[in-house]
Amino acid sequence: MAKRTLGLGNAARAKKQKLEQEGKSKSPTPSGSEDTTNQLTIELPETVDANDEIAQLRGLYKTYIDSERDSDLILNGIIHECDRLLREKVANSSGSKENQVSAELPAMFYKIYAIALSELANFHTDDIDQVSEFFDASLERVNDGLEKYPTDIDLVFTKAKILINQIVLQYVSQLKLESSVEEAHIKNMDIKGKLDAALRVYESAEKKAKESEDYLAFNSEEYWDILEAVDDLLDIVDNFGRQEEEEEEEEEEEEEEEEKEDHAKKGGELTELDVADAEAFAAAQEKIEGEEKGSETSDNDEEDNEEEEEEEEDEDEEEEIELPETHPLYIIKTTDEYNQWWRDHTLTYLSNLKQLSNASPRLLREVNHRLGQSYLQEAEVPSSVFTTLRYDEDYSGIEELEGLSEDDAKRVAQELIIKALEYLKAAEDKDEPESWVNIAEAMISLANLYEVESKEQEQLYQDAEKILTKANNATNGKYQDALDNLLG
């Protein structure tokens, strides 16, 4: 993510300030803001009232949400505008009416303010202290809003979103493979505790929506992003340390190359004995190769092919990084609790989204797609167990793998892929061939679980072939390889 500052004035400088009587800004703000804020010009829709400052703020916020989010220019503009509105409200108030005047700022104001502050942390990831201050300030803002609007669903979702993002940017980012639970607790980095707390906040938003029968918030990709962020976090945990290990391997390879170069530079001329030995070895090797040539050519070719296949398999199967039990992420990685939480609440999200008559078709497809993919992923283990026990001679006589018999593995895998197909079909986009191919690939996976040349298998293959042919024609041959593999 971009770290360069394209904001107003000088580089963003985190500065946490204590709010007193709703009048003092708590947000870390860029310096030189007053003179440069006016330089930010955003074209707002004609429907936005030029005299409605909150409407203008919402327009500015929407501009950022709809952008590539690769610059903090608009974010700084939003924060400065929020600061100004807050100061202006307090300045125009007096005496006991102060709280009433401050309350005129709607819940949306606190949401926008908090999100802008948390998003700004993305542009300062090289300074963990600044990241911490941005998240602290954003949480203070959303909590201020919740004090005034405790039943506002958007604010509760906003808090959950900030907490999840904070876990990744502020806490997980500081962990190493050698990090320990004890060290994490000292630094107030109880990742599991913070994740549990964030998920409880999300659940409270769900509960409020159900109690009030207000499901409008679920029609926003902003809040769907929360579940995606949870999924991404779990993916980070599953693959934690891989990048660190790859970097170490690259460094070792570079060091070896340097050592070889140094050795070559330091090496002197060969002695007569060295030369004689080398010539004798070369002659013997040539004689052996001449005698064996032809008689072993086919055998060698087969061995080479087998070695190449094994190398390809090794490349495809990345070795899993094992975390020690003392690692802060170990307890999250080794339980299925959070994957199940994601699945359950994604299903709830889809159910709530369907309550709306004007639910976003794009969002419906995306949620269905993610659910379909999650069921396919879950089906990988039982599918592999079935294939291994059924067709791999090396496992002949073995009745169970991963706690599953051949029949159980087949049944479980079939059920999961059938479920996946249900969601993938609901995610189909008539204008997007890739969504068709997702369905075809799931059909092929399901077909492979039936008896060879059975009626069920042949029907699934035929259906998949039709879909792949259609997708291939629509994309000028993009899926020809997939089609050839099926027909071959």
Swiss-Prot record:
Compositionally biased residues, Polar residues: 26-38
Keyword Transcription carried by entry: yes
GO cellular component: nucleus
Highest taxon in the source lineage: Eukaryota
Transcription is among the record's keywords: yes
Keywords: Nucleus, Transcription, Transcription regulation, Translation regulation
Skewed-composition ranges (Acidic residues): 244-260, 298-323
Compartment(s) where it occurs, according to its Swiss-Prot or TrEMBL record: Nucleus
Gene Ontology biological process terms in this record: positive regulation of SREBP signaling pathway; regulation of translation
InterPro entries tied to this protein: Nro1/ETT1
Record region (Disordered): 1-38, 242-272, 287-328
Chief location bin: nucleus
Pfam families documented for this protein: Nro1
Residue ranges, compositional bias (Basic and acidic residues): 287-296
Role played: Required for correct translation termination and probably involved in regulation of hypoxic gene expression.
Family that this chain belongs to: Belongs to the ETT1 family.
Protein's name in the database: Enhancer of translation termination 1
Gene name per UniProt: ETT1
